[in-house]
From Swiss-Prot:
It holds the Pfam family IspA. GO terms for cellular component: plasma membrane. It is found in: Cell inner membrane. It is a multi-pass membrane protein. This is Inner membrane-spanning protein YciB. Its main location: membrane. The gene is yciB. PANTHER family: INNER MEMBRANE-SPANNING PROTEIN YCIB (PTHR36917:SF1), INTRACELLULAR SEPTATION PROTEIN A-RELATED (PTHR36917). InterPro entries: YciB. Plays a role in cell envelope biogenesis, maintenance of cell envelope integrity and membrane homeostasis. Keywords: Cell inner membrane, Cell membrane, Membrane, Transmembrane, Transmembrane helix.
Amino acid sequence: MKQLLDFLPLVIFFAVYKFYDIYAATGVLIAATAIQLVITYLIYKHIEKMHLATFAMVTVFGSLTLFFHDDAFIKWKVSIVYALFAIGLIASQIMGKSALKSMLGKEMKVDDRIWAQVTWYWVGFFVLCSFANIYIAFNLPLETWVNFKVFGLTALTLINTVITVVYLYKNMQDDNSQPTDNQ
């Protein structure tokens, strides 16, 4: 349910873009993301920081897109969000606290070395997605960018999530093993 709720603004953005234009889709994206936060809070009584950050980025860059009637702002938002995810993972790794371990460590007991590998894998993924978005957004037609944003990046993220889970599962410790450094 939560994952479906996460994708709802993106699906609505795509549908509105197909029937209207990028500006209508951007306005609806801002509204849908706000509604998503409200629904998430009503159901789970909690809103994750990532959702708040995403809402802030959508609101700022979406508003700039609408105010200046320039789709470059909403295109940049995608790359900036991915770059911020990469920076956040790097910062957490440097501080010795894996953000991914914090999110998944209770379900998946693996060595800290594995968490570090997975973190750097995702840093690379986010950086590549950020640059791919810039290239596609500013060198290919708008419709290609919208399709890439909605389907390409979503598919790539799902594929990388599966790869990560398989890798973590393959490296899981049994319950009788010694705890890792930060457990």
